[in-house]
Amino acid sequence: MKTLLALLIALGTGMSSLAQENPLAGVIDIHVHCAPDSTPRKIDAIDLARLAKNRGMRGLVLKNHYEPTASLAYVVRKEVPGIEVFGGVDLNLSVGGMNPSAVEHMAATTGGYGRFVWMSTFDSEAQVRYSKQDRPFVRVSQNGQLLPETRQVIALIAKDNLVLATGHPTAEEALMMIREGRSQGVKHMVVTHAMIAPIHMSDAQMLEAAKMGAYIEFVYNGLIGSYKEFTFKDYARAIRYVGAEHCILASDMGQPANPLHPDGLLALFDGLKKEGITEAEINRMAKENPARLLGLE
């Protein structure tokens, strides 16, 4: 297995060099899971960066549910020059939940590669309740109002020009955070895999978020394995409703049983093309929009 993985990294599977055009050239995957992690992962960050670079990708955003990844992004960039790698912080219980201090320290990390703030994922109240778990959770709102600490985190996101990523809230909580972000001057916002549980945004809610300046994320992980809830047809319909100019395609790969990230992206692109999404729209959603979200264009 290790020998095969090394070969894939070294050759980029050999497929892109055979293609007249490489559909991964210039792609930025904003939703990447990899080792080191407390959850088993298919590949580590350095090997993934090498693989993505050899496949022609422009960049990666490293996501860890429990550890900030800005420091990891700095190290990966030194080890694998030629690919833009970013990190962030996911406001789960391991970093104190909705903790402004965690955001401040992430933003100040050497290199300035910490860009994303996920507003709690696996420990969010919505996720814990949806999963019917009896354990502590991170709350972003109460009685229909964002908590003061949530507003404080959003203020820091605006101050440091970071990306507000909604994480795993309810759909209405995601909209509340997007409204607050817009009010406080946040320039970069994305609704994390908006269609997937526990968010389950409707088409109308996705369009509302988009009209407030947020990108809507669609991930390959929502189409396969244990997380499969939707079909390519469902995704294509939603993309047409919202408009490709407001959408981002990402892999959300890294699970041991799933494909490697570049292959997940290719499968996502191919499936959407079969449903009538054009190559120009895919390029917009996988290359241009992620770059704008990260402030690269």
Model-identified regions with their sequence ranges:
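A metal-dependent hydrolase metal-coordination microenvironment
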Residues: 42-136
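Structural preference for beta-strand elements that scaffold enzyme active sites
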Residues: 27-29, 59, 84-86, 114-118, ...
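Short acidic/histidine-rich active-site segments
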Residues: 244-261
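Distinct, well-ordered alpha-helical segments
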Residues: 72-76, 171-185, 201-210, 231-239
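Divalent metal-binding pocket/active-site signature
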Residues: 34-43, 116-201
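Bacterial N-terminal signal peptides
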Residues: 4-14
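Mid-to-C-terminal alpha-helical segments outside catalytic/metal-binding sites
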Residues: 264-297
